[in-house]
Amino acid sequence: LNFKALAALAKKIL
């Protein structure tokens, strides 16, 4: 998992 994927996930959750 890369940073962009993590950022997208965080944005979806938050």
Curated annotation (Swiss-Prot):
Example GO CC term: the record gives: extracellular region
Molecular function per GO: toxin activity
Question: Where are residues bearing Leucine amide located in the sequence?
Answer: 14
Q: What is this protein called?
A: Polistes-mastoparan-R2
Compartments, record wording: Secreted; Target cell membrane
| BP GO annotations | killing of cells of another organism
User: What family does the database annotate?
Assistant: Belongs to the MCD family. Mastoparan subfamily.
Show the InterPro entries listed in the entry: Mastoparan
**Which UniProt keywords are listed?**
Amidation, Cytolysis, G-protein coupled receptor impairing toxin, Mast cell degranulation, Membrane, Secreted, Target cell membrane, Target membrane, Toxin
- Primary site of residence: secreted
Main role?
Mast cell degranulating peptide with high potency of histamine release (EC(50)=0.26 uM on rat mast cells). and high hemolytic activity (23% sheep erythrocytes lysis at 50 mM). Its mast cell degranulation activity may be related to the activation of G-protein coupled receptors in mast cells as well as interaction with other proteins located in cell endosomal membranes in the mast cells.
Extract the Pfam families matched here. Answer: Mastoparan
